[in-house]
């Protein structure tokens, strides 16, 4: 996001985590040399942390090289198409979300409703789990819909139809 808004030059610490989306562990921190030296010499958590094993460094390098590839750029473009499509279809169906990324939250507010809907959707072949209290604040139980570039537009559309039906009919 900082890159897209041309803000990199204004950021003191640029942290690039490699977990979850990066499929690995660890992170990169980009900063001025004086800040790097300060962290190395003064940060207790850094001082008493061991380095990642060499296999993790090699895996991270492999992942970063993949992220620079043409194939990855094509997949990223396809993912953004699916994000736009999904958000448009959710809006058309009156399903509210504040999300704008490939992980889309749909808040239902009720743990019991989430449990019933996730059971019904799994029986229909959708791999979905709700996020319930206490993992989220009271009355904000939700589904997190994760998109990837391999999901067909038809499957997204079918899922949204089923989700809408469940949201309208459960309780």
Locate predicted features:
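Amphipathic alpha-helix from the class-I
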Residues: 57-74, 91
């Amino acid at each position: 996001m900082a890159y897209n808004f041309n803000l990199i030059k204004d950021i003191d610490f640029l942290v690039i985590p490699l977990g979850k989306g990066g499929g690995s562990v660890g992170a990169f921190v980009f900063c001025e040399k004086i800040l790097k030296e300060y962290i190395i010499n003064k940060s207790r958590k850094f001082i008493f942390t061991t380095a990642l094993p060499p296999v993790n460094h090699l895996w991270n390098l492999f992942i970063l090289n993949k992220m620079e590839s043409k194939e990855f750029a094509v997949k990223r473009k396809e993912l953004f198409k699916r994000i736009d499509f999904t958000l448009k279809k959710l809006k058309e169906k009156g399903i509210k979300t504040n999300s704008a990324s490939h992980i889309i939250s749909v808040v239902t507010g009720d743990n019991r409703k989430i449990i019933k809907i996730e059971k019904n959707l799994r029986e229909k072949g959708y791999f979905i789990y709700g996020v319930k209290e206490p993992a989220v604040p009271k009355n904000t139980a939700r589904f997190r819909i994760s998109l990837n570039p391999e999901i067909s537009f038809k499957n997204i559309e079918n899922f949204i139809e089923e989700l809408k039906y469940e949201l309208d009919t459960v309780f």
